[in-house]
From Swiss-Prot:
Pfam families tied to this protein: DUF1604 (PF07713), G-patch (PF01585)
GO biological process, one term: mRNA splicing, via spliceosome
Residue span of region Disordered: 104-127, 165-233, 320-345, 370-432, 660-711, 822-952
GO terms assigned for molecular function: RNA binding
Biased composition (Acidic residues): 214-233
Positions of the G-patch domain: 153-199
Biased composition (Low complexity): 886-896
GO cellular component annotations of the record: catalytic step 2 spliceosome; nucleus; precatalytic spliceosome
The protein's name: G patch domain-containing protein 1 homolog
Basic and acidic residues: compositionally biased ranges: 107-123, 375-402, 414-432, 679-691
InterPro entries: DUF1604, G_patch_dom
Similarity comment: Belongs to the GPATCH1 family.
Length: 952
């Protein structure tokens, strides 16, 4: 039992043989065995056996015998050379098979197949190979066949190496010094030791290199002398892809002369020339190799002592090989003659078209020459007679051209003018003449004849002398009236764009009359006329204006003159254009020197501060040249473009007139500004008429323009006005109203929120200095008429915003603020002074600073309280609690607003106090709480509906 437990069985066991039963299958004797082909048919027959089957299956050709597959006509290929037939064309597949008389094998003729080791290897390696090895072969040395079958020329790689300076016996690689060569030899010796002890084949040892080591030690310092590397066989570590032991290759199934077998075979191994060849990638010409004569079917072959054992000779299974039988056609094809089969390839037949010959067609032998003295055919004579009939009737003149007719009539031909001699015809050359002269010139071209009546043509009688004199007088009067009229050709009288500058207008007229087109010629022409005082920029601008004005204000005559060209001059212009060589454009190289500045995006990527605090301009913007603007650049463009087009809208006209006010001495406080309604009602006799009238924008347009470029943080008031309830605006005072109360108490003009640009305008109170002082200083003539401007003039409320800050903060510029935000570690250079030297302030600035401090204190006292943060209330809360919270919040807000109203009544005397505001506010707060409760109930109802729908 123990032995059976430890016994391992693999596979399915054969059925056990019974003792009494004899096995049914008996071994077949040799004389009873039958040789069969791949189809399972009997291959060899007797002289009178086999019958139809033997002749059908064993004939040369296809499986069906000599049945033709396709028919190809050789009628059109008679002239072509006939293909030379080969013995393989008359052989069957069995003859070309493995056991046939001419088995096919593939052999390549490649320059890379055999290596010329005798030339490439050194003398050491050759001597090593010549030494006999045990178990290799009976003949020592290099194989004789390998020496006989050497390639005629070297390989491509060897030829390339020789062209690069390589010589046989040297290694491949860069040249080495003595020290490097010694290290390489030591490394190669280690690799050879490993190959000898752990590899399959021992490599030749370089014993001669040991003698060189002593000489190398002498001149170690001489690094200028280099040597070629030693020629050694590199080690290629092939991956192990089998399960054999180390250095065991096993039975190789590859043919002898294949790549895989040649790489693994030893150099002294015998080469079998009768094995199958391997097809290389380049597919060289095939050749048939093999035994010339076969052996009988029932005879054993002689053992080939030179052959190598192959695994294809062994069976790996006990089962018999069942040959694959091909399906045979047993069904007779329809409409096919016996012995033939239907063609499977589609035949493309050209459809022949019948030629319709005429009834009277008579064939003619065109090779037979006719005599010119032979009589003409009747048909041909009849055709010639009909063709010349119209000439005999006098109609042949229509076949003549004008030259032939002039030659027959004997006329003298007028010499045609060449295209160069003919002047360019101007269809508007008579425009400079008067109207009557042109009418007379037209009437003179007509031939005068008599009046045709019933009796015949009556000749025209000459006019009387008095009538002629009267007509001449009328023509003179008409010529006098039309004398001063501007003609179309005289462009100077029609249009004078530079009439303000007579010299410039004169230059323009000369430029128009010159009719120059080349830019270089125009520049030279104007340079001769322009004064010396003109700068280069003015000269270029004047040239550009002249060209543009000549294009725009070109008379109609010139435009039409270019369109109508005489036919004789077209060819001449084409010839001139072809002969004219292309102009060479001069390339002007400009060099600019700019300071490099990294972009803001690059500074963000590297997490560093921008240089100069980001105040330096971009180099692309600096390099952009300023456009040279001229009036004539925009004359052809449209007035309205997509960018500036606005839809027309009608608004009521409202013109606000600024009223100058007299200001008292500086120590006295400025008077409070009157309301706008009172200012408009009071008539002002000293008012000057307003020079510019404009239609102001509507409040909606102003709000949109102001909020267009603002950030979202500054649009809070706009969002509040849209989304908040109107009750809050009525209950609570806005910040603008509180600001207005403070401004009225101090006598300042009522202002509202504006942009930072308007705020900077108020801050910049210093007078203009330097070269710009004359530009911004008030004129002397108008100074007497206009009163002195007030320090706080009336400014429109929608354009200003006052932020109450200390003067120190307002006097800082943008650069100081940017530099203050930068950490001190990021700043490169000496440390900046902490506190700049203070100068004694002027009395006016000191007074203004005191006013600012006073305003700051009042603003802190009367500043609006911060709005409480709103809490998020869930929809499931009880509506009663919401009502109570809303009422309490409204009561608190109403109490706050009532306190603000009391303060407001104390500060502003002209304003009237509001009575009963608290009662109204309480009613509104109750209504508001009811609305909120209704909204919460509706939202709950909608949420329930959504849940039901999601469940369904």
């Amino acid at each position: 039992m123990d032995e059976e437990e430890h016994l391992h069985r693999f596979g399915t066991p054969l059925p056990a043989l019974q003792k009494d039963v004899v096995p049914a299958k008996k071994p077949v004797a040799i004389e009873d065995q039958i040789v069969k082909d791949e189809n399972g048919k009997r291959r060899f027959h007797g002289a009178f056996t086999g019958g139809f089957s033997a002749g059908f299956w064993n004939t040369v050709g296809s499986l069906e015998g000599w049945t033709p597959q396709t028919f190809k006509s050789s009628r059109g290929e008679r002239a072509s050379s006939k293909a030379q037939l080969k013995p393989e064309d008359f052989m069957d597949q069995e003859d070309l098979g493995e056991f046939g008389i001419a088995p096919q094998g593939i052999r390549t003729r490649d320059e890379f197949a055999n290596e010329d080791e005798q030339k490439q290897r050194s003398d050491q390696r050759r001597r090593k190979l010549m030494q006999p090895e045990l178990g290799v072969g009976a003949i020592p040395g290099l194989p004789v066949l390998e020496q006989l079958l050497r390639p005629v020329r070297d390989k491509v790689a060897v030829r390339i190496l020789k062209s690069m300076g390589w010589k046989p016996g040297q290694g491949v690689g860069p040249r080495q010094t003595r020290k490097e060569k010694r290290q390489a030899t030591a490394r190669n010796s280690k690799e050879q030791y490993l190959m000898e002890h752990y590899g399959a084949e021992g490599l030749p040892s370089n014993k001669e290199n040991k003698g060189e080591e002593d000489s190398n030690n002498e001149d170690e310092d001489d690094e200028d002398i280099t040597f070629a590397p030693d020629d050694y066989e590199p080690i290629f570590y092939t991956p192990k892809e089998n399960r054999f032991g180390m250095s065991y290759s096993g039975l190789n199934r590859d043919p002898i002369l294949s790549k895989s077998s040649s790489s693994s075979a030893k150099p002294m191994q015998h080469i079998n020339l009768f094995g199958e060849m391997e097809a290389q990638a380049n597919k060289k010409q095939l050749s048939i190799r093999g035994q010339a004569f076969g052996v009988g079917a029932f005879e054993e072959e002689d053992e080939d002592i030179y052959a190598r054992d192959d695994m294809t000779r062994y069976d790996f299974s006990l089962a018999d090989k069942k040959p694959k039988q091909k399906k045979q056609q047993h069904v007779q094809q329809r409409h096919v003659i016996d012995g033939f089969s239907e063609d499977n390839s589609p035949a493309v037949l050209q459809r022949p078209y019948a030629i319709d010959l005429p009834r009277d067609f008579q064939p003619r032998n065109w090779l037979q020459r006719r005599s010119r003295f032979a009589p003409m055919d009747k048909e041909r004579a009849q055709k010639l007679e009909t063709a010349s009939e119209y000439k005999r009737s006098g109609l042949g003149r229509h076949d003549l051209n004008p030259d032939q007719r002039a030659q027959i009539l004997g006329e003298q031909q007028q010499e045609e003018k060449t295209a160069e001699e003919q002047p360019k015809r101007n269809p508007f050359k008579d425009h400079s003449k008067s109207l009557m002269e042109r009418i007379n010139a037209r009437t003179e071209g007509f031939t005068k004849g008599g009046v045709i009546t019933e009796n015949g043509e009556e000749q025209q009688t000459e006019l009387a002398k008095e009538v002629k004199e009267a007509n001449a007088a009328i023509q003179e009067r008409a010529a006098l009236k039309t004398k001063d009229l501007p003609s179309a050709m005289n462009s100077s009288s029609a249009f004078k764009p530079f009439i303000a500058d007579e010299a410039k207008q004169l230059r323009y007229e000369k430029f128009v009359s010159s009719k120059l087109t080349d830019d270089k010629e125009i520049t030279e022409f104007l340079a001769r006329m322009q004064p010396v005082t003109l700068s280069l920029w003015d000269r270029e601008m004047e040239k550009k204006e002249f060209i543009q004005a000549a294009k725009i204000y070109r008379p109609l005559v010139g435009l039409m003159n270019d369109r109508f060209v005489s036919e004789a001059n077209v060819q001449a212009e084409k010839v001139e254009q072809q002969e004219k060589p292309p102009e060479e454009r001069k390339i002007v190289m400009e060099r600019t020197k700019t300071m490099w500045k990294p972009t803001a995006l690059l500074c963000k990527r590297y997490n560093i501060a921008e240089p100069f605090g980001g105040a330096m301009l971009e180099p692309e913007k600096e390099l952009k040249a300023k456009a040279k603007i001229s009036v004539f650049d925009y004359l052809e463009t449209s007035v309205n473009t997509k960018a500036n087009f606005e839809t027309p809208s009608i608004f009521p006209k409202h013109i606000e007139k600024s009223i100058p006010e007299k200001v008292e001495t500086p120590p006295s406080p400025p008077p409070a500004p009157q309301p706008e309604a009172e200012i408009q009602d009071k008539p002002n006799t000293k008012e000057e008429p307003s020079k510019h009238t404009f239609v102001p924008k509507t409040p909606l347009e102003q709000a949109v323009d102001e909020s267009r470029n603002k950030p979202i943080s500054e649009k809070v008031d706009l969002f509040k006005s849209i989304f908040e309830d109107s009750d809050e605006e009525e209950t609570e005072l806005s910040e603008q109203d509180k600001l207005a109360i403070l401004q009225e108490s101090f006598g300042l003009p009522v202002t509202s929120t504006t942009s930072a640009a308007a705020q900077n305008v108020l801050r910049n109170t210093s007078p203009p200095r330097g070269i710009f002082a004359s530009l911004f200083s008030p004129k002397i003539k108008d100074a007497a008429k206009e009163p002195a401007p007030t320090k706080f003039g009336p400014i429109e409320g929608s354009k200003l915003k006052i932020a109450y800050k200390p003067r120190k903060e307002r006097l800082r510029n943008d650069r100081e603020l940017a530099m203050a935000e930068v950490a001190p570690e990021d700043i490169y250079g000496p440390k900046l002074p902490t506190a700049p030297p203070q100068k004694p302030a002027a009395p006016e600035i000191q007074a203004e600073a005191n006013i600012d401090d006073r305003l700051q204190q009042l603003w802190q006292q009367h500043a609006p309280k911060k709005r409480k943060a709103e809490k998020w209330v869930e929809k499931k809360c009880i509506s009663g609690s919401e009502d109570s919270d809303a009422s309490s919040s409204n009561e608190s807000s109403s109490s706050d607003s009532s306190d603000d109203n009391d303060k407001r009544s104390k500060l502003s005397k002209p304003k009237k106090s509001h009575k009963g505001s608290s009662s109204k506010k309480s009613k509104k707060s109750k209504l508001k709480s009811k609305k909120k409760s209704k909204k919460s109930e509706e939202s709950k109802h909608k949420a329930k509906k959504k849940k039901k729908k999601s469940k369904h």
